[in-house]
Structure formats: structure tokens, C-alpha cells
Amino acid sequence: MTQSQYRPGPDANGLFGSFGGRYVAETLMPLVLDLAREYEAAKADPKFLEELAYFQRDYIGRPNPLYFAERLTEHCGGAKIFFKREELNHTGAHKVNNCIGQVLLAKRMGKKRLIAETGAGMHGVATATVAARFGLPCVIYMGATDIERQQANVFRMKLLGAEIVPVTAGTGTLKDAMNEALRDWVTNVEDTFYLIGTVAGPHPYPAMVRDFQSIIGKETRAQLQEKEGRLPDSLVACVGGGSNAMGLFHEFLEEPSVQIIGVEAGGHGVHTDKHAASLNGGVPGVLHGNRTYLLQDQDGQITDAHSISAGLDYPGIGPEHAYLHEVKRVEYVSITDDEALDAFHATCRLEGIIPALESSHALAEAIKRAPKLPKDHLMVVCLSGRGDKDMQTVMNHMAAQEKHA
């Protein structure tokens, strides 16, 4: 496997190795083919790229900083830790990078209505935000379980004018919301644009979302070059579907000196049935239009994912991650709920930054690794979102701990 093959594509059929593809209903096939054509044309259009750059700068607030986490670095006593500050974006996470790109594409295609799925609510908020900015009606599908634990984001979406459809099927989480959104899309193919929130779904979504997120890695390269005069030694990001990770990783896949670590949600532990670690605890299968690693039982039924973090609570992973796992370019590990919570508290106290529970999984892995590494090792952690949305979850967890103390 030569280095140049780490950033292969996907190919014309949307495949990364044996992963990805377009496993969709016949009624949707013309639509995804049309979307792929439109996206290729937009990518080659200087006017589209100019408009995208304008919104990235003046609406999202990019570039965001690459911040040296000095006190966390001292606390760990090893590698020099930098945070890529995606939580400083408008709407408080990396999700808006992708939403701005897709809404500009929807506008270009003449679509009149946006739909999306959301787990933690951050993609829902980002979609509702861009829908408001461009004057488009917007329907957000959200699992009933997630609505319960993400009340603040539900209210934000409503404030922005979105209609929220609670999904009670299955476990009432992200995978069920995605199923409902796909059903809506099949029914309303003419005027509706489905704004997928992660690097999953049928081709061209995994590549398109990655491309819109790849600004994270591009900025990181330039910013670290300016600060340290060289490439990072390691990159760490949390992986649910995996768009913040793909956004950071993609720029560095062909740099053999850069070690890349994706962090899955280990829940109560990968040895239990309460986790969301598709690569460390799943097998290949097909879900939501693409072939990837999935959590499934012996009969091939999708099993429930569990994570304290609603945004990582997905039983699959983006197909490019599955490919990078198989060719061993990226190392995928898992972090438990408790480890993520410890890292959450440490980051609050040491850096004065309240990270999302998703990002706390990456921080936990960084805190584990840093002490074993030399002081000149440069580690970049993607701080994918801020933790405001997780206050209730953390409060509940702390209250439960006090009860058991």
C-alpha cells in the first residue's frame, strides 16, 4: 500500500476499497447520481468556492485558532498538546462547516426545502441556522430519546424556525432519525435537499461532507507550520460517524510521519453490549446507503449503540474510516463514558474550556498518551464542539455518583 493510495477517492461508484457505495432505493438512485454531478460541477466553479469562502470567514468565523493547551500539557508532563478550536465556530461545533457547503449546493440546485437528521442536536442546530440564513423551510428528524437529553438544542432549533419531528421507532436515537429522514427524501425527491450531518450515507455524501470539513486539517497544517515550523506528530479526534475526524485527518493521510488516532465511544466498555465502537466491536454490513462497519447481532440485525455522548451514539461509522482502519493508516481506539467524563472535568479546570462530551473522548485519549511521549512531540486534538448542550447529562451523572458515594 503506497502512501498515495491513502487518499484514493472514492472511485466513481463511491467506494473506498470495499466500503461506501450507493445502496439506495431505486427511486433515490437518480437523485444521488444527480447530486454527485452537481457537486462535481460546484467544486470546479470558482464562484461557488468564492461564496463558500465568504461564508466560512464572515458567517462561521474561520479560521478558528490552534491553541497551545499549556496547563493540560504541564498536567500530563509529556507531549505538547494543541487544541483545534472548532467549538469557537458559529453554532458551537464543527457541524456548520458542512451545513454551509451543502446549503449553498442546495440553493445552486434550486431545492426549496431542507431535511436533516440529528443526534446531539448540533447538526440540527447548524442545519436550522443555515436554513434561516437562506430562507428555506427545514424539517429535522430527531430520536425521542435524544430529544429528552438535548432539550436546549431542541429549543434552539425551534427558535431558528425548524420543525422537529420526534422519532420513536427503534431506540429513538440517531440511526432511527436517519431512517425517517431517508423516508421523507424518497417521498419528496423533487423539491427537497437531504443535508446529511456526517461522512456516511450513499455516495457522494461521505466524500462531500469530508471535503467541506477538510478545512479543519488545512488550517491546522498552516497554523502549526507558523507556530512550530513543522507537521504535527500525532492527531487525535473523536469518531461517531466521523466527520470532525475526517476533516482533521484528510490533509495528513499522505504524511507518513503523522500518527493518526480516531477515538470511538466505548460506553461501558467494548467487552459489554453498551458501547458505540463500530470498528472495535462491529463487523462490515450495509446501513443508510453505504457499506461500512456496523454493530450487529448474529442475524445481521443492527444493535443499539450506547454512549454518554448523544453525538457518538451511532451503530456505524463513515466508510472512509472503515477503509483507513483496514489499511491500518489510522489507529482506532475506544474511550469509556467514565474516562470521557474525567477528561471533561480536567479540561474545564485546567484550561477554562468546557468541551462537548464527544470531544472529551478525544481529550481522554490525548491525556492517556501524552505522558508517555517526549516533550517535543506535537499532538493536535480536535475540540469538535462546546459542552453547553451536555450540562444536564453531566449534572445527572454527578448526582448519581453522589448518591452511590
Curated annotation (Swiss-Prot):
- Gene3D superfamilies the UniProt entry points to: 3.40.50.1100
Pathway(s) served = Amino-acid biosynthesis; L-tryptophan biosynthesis; L-tryptophan from chorismate: step 5/5
Top EC group: lyase
Give an example GO cellular component term for this record: cytoplasm
Q: Which cofactor does it need?
A: pyridoxal 5'-phosphate
| N6-(pyridoxal phosphate)lysine: modified positions | K95
Pfam families in the record, alphabetically?
A: PALP (PF00291)
According to the UniProt entry, its GO molecular function terms are: tryptophan synthase activity
Catalysis performed (reactions): (1S,2R)-1-C-(indol-3-yl)glycerol 3-phosphate + L-serine = D-glyceraldehyde 3-phosphate + L-tryptophan + H2O
Q: Sorted alphabetically, which InterPro entries does this protein's record hold?
A: Trp_synth_b_CS, Trp_synth_beta, Trp_synth_beta/beta-like, TrpB-like_PALP, TrpB-like_PALP_sf
> What are the EC numbers?
4.2.1.20
Q: Which UniProt keywords apply?
A: Amino-acid biosynthesis, Aromatic amino acid biosynthesis, Lyase, Pyridoxal phosphate, Tryptophan biosynthesis
Instruction: State the family named in the UniProt similarity comment for this chain.
Output: Belongs to the TrpB family.
Purpose: The beta subunit is responsible for the synthesis of L-tryptophan from indole and L-serine.
- Subunit details for this protein? Tetramer of two alpha and two beta chains.
| Entry protein name | Tryptophan synthase beta chain
